[in-house]
Amino acid sequence: MRNDIADPEGPPRKGRLREEGMAALTLGALGVVFGDIGTSPIYAFREALGQAAEDGIVAGEILGVLSLALWALILVVTCKYVLFLMRADNNGEGGVLALMTLAQRSTRRRRTLVMALGAIGAALFYGDGVITPALSVLSAVEGLKTIPGLEHSVSRGEILLITSAILIGLFLMQARGTRIVGRLFGPVCLVWFVTIGGIGLIHIADQPAILAALLPHNGVLFMANHGVAGMFVMGAVFLTVTGAEALTADMGHFGAKPIRTGWLAIVFPALALNYLGQGAFALHRLEVASARGVEFVNQDWFFLMAPGLARIPLVILATCATVIASQAVITGAYSLTRQAIQLGLLPRLKIRQTSEHAAGQIYLPTITMLLFVGVMVLVLGFGSSSAMAAAYGVSVSGTMVVTTCLAFLVVRRSWGWGWPLTVAVIVPLLLLDLFFFGANILRIYEGGWVPLIVAGGVGLLIVTWVRGRKLLLAIDQSQAIELEELARMLRARPPERVPGMAIFLSSGMEAAPSALLHNLKHNKILHERNLALTINTVNQPAVPAAQRLDMTNIDENFTRAVLNYGFMESPDIPRDLAFALRHGDNKLEPMQTSYFIGRSTLRPSKHSGMPFWQDLLFIFLYRNASDPTDFFRIPPNRVVELGSQTTI
């Protein structure tokens, strides 16, 4: 949503392609959507080949590993995401929470299960969000060790120092926003994809036999011959598709067609050429090692493909690309957090708009700090991208399993698919996801526990917040009085009246707001006009201006109002009320309007619906939630807070 009152909806989503142009949107998608998966060649093939080469390697195994990588891209990204999941959008928005709300709309009996799946997917995303910046930037900076003359002069400590400096700069930049520098993301990534594709093509020309890796039977033979060891290789192969979930998560920003075009026309060809080039280069080195009678050594194939001093600009370009990929993940974490807050999965956090014109340009200080601490702990704790790579796939593969489960509910309930078609499409995709998830679970002891710990922590917060809010709402409802009943009582015994308009924020649509009851109890006054206002989040990304406000007149003293928001929107009560009430007798006069907010002081109870420790955790979250005045953008000098004490 834009910040001007004249057009709170922003440009229509369907007209965006015509307004901005396919080329511009596709270029923008290169920097935001494909940054993560586009930088995987730096480390993915190296890690997969390293797993395969632990007991020696032959040419057929190089072809097998490469075949697995290429067909992972084809099956997971192209078939599952591009051809299937990108059709499952919620009014143009994608991602695990958008899919969750779409599934909730299509089923009534399984809403709790659907919310649980969405919460698990969101929690796993945060595990991914901590690892991506650490792994990608560190892997790019490690390319310095491949530059002639620096192989032995650059120490591990210096690599970590440079990586830390880049990441510190990246996180410091978040408070200022990325609107200006963000314009460079697309062009830089276009140069990146052209460069890595071109380098790969050169080595393919030297070793055309590597094209045999395009035949899937090489991958099948590799898995058949390697048993459990092959599963460890598959866990590393999965690194080639990490970041695929961004294709659906960013549909709301660019549209499905530009993302599909970017993948099929630019990104996939560039990635395939680069992986084939790395395989060709490794095959050449294997032949040289065999001819000399020396042992084959797994190396940084990505950087070593470039000749000599050409690695200097390649390292610089790789660092820029990984910073862009990291920025996309950070922005994704902001967007997901806002959705989770709006859907009631997380407490309110301070959200700051960093652009007057782009609703997606937001900054969350709490999320920034938590991500920064997590990223720096990983960089300094693991010390190398190879050590960290094992931690990467678990959360992403888990998210993919959740996504497919939600997609099952959508195609059955929302799209109306029959069982034969549903089974024919969903079962193979789910088996593929479970196969990759199982391969990554094997690597838990190598670092895969890290994202699970992060996801488990976030999941605990979500469960505690949702359960605590339900308990608090039940307590409020048990003590509540209906607004209509209160209005009748006040007509019989009217209190003293004061001029102006009072807006009472309420969590329920039928009950009288607690702030109104406390105002009558302690101040014994009633304003000329009184509005009981409820904020309602609907299961769609955005709400048109015509559907923003629902109003019901109770009597001449009271009006019940509901402000409707989509899960991708940030509430702005004064702006949206002013726009909706710009005509007629209910016109909002800012300087004659007071906002009354009820705030409870919570006390734990050993007899509530949650364990005592969870009561304490919920109270901590409740106390540290963003002030509703800031979150709803209400002028502080127009707010009256009335408190009460509640035992949960």
From Swiss-Prot:
Q: What is its main location?
A: membrane
Q: Which Pfam families match?
A: K_trans, K_trans_C
**Among its keywords, does the record have NADP?**
no
Could you tell me where this protein is found in the cell?
A: Cell inner membrane
Q: Which residues cross the membrane?
A: 25-45, 57-77, 113-133, 153-173, 184-204, 219-239, 263-283, 312-332, 362-382, 391-411, 417-437, 446-466
Q: Which membrane topology term applies here? A: Multi-pass membrane protein
Q: Where is the signal peptide?
A: none
Output a single Gene Ontology CC term carried by this record.
plasma membrane
A molecular function GO annotation: symporter activity
List the catalytic activities from the record.
K(+)(in) + H(+)(in) = K(+)(out) + H(+)(out)
InterPro entries, alphabetized:
K+_transporter, K_trans_C, K_trans_N, Kup
Instruction: Please provide the record's keywords in A-Z order.
Output: Cell inner membrane, Cell membrane, Ion transport, Membrane, Potassium, Potassium transport, Symport, Transmembrane, Transmembrane helix, Transport
* Origin superkingdom: Bacteria
Family that this chain belongs to: Belongs to the HAK/KUP transporter (TC 2.A.72) family.
Q: What does this protein do?
A: Transport of potassium into the cell. Likely operates as a K(+):H(+) symporter.
Entry protein name = Probable potassium transport system protein Kup 1
Q: Which organism is it from?
A: Rhizorhabdus wittichii (strain DSM 6014 / CCUG 31198 / JCM 15750 / NBRC 105917 / EY 4224 / RW1)
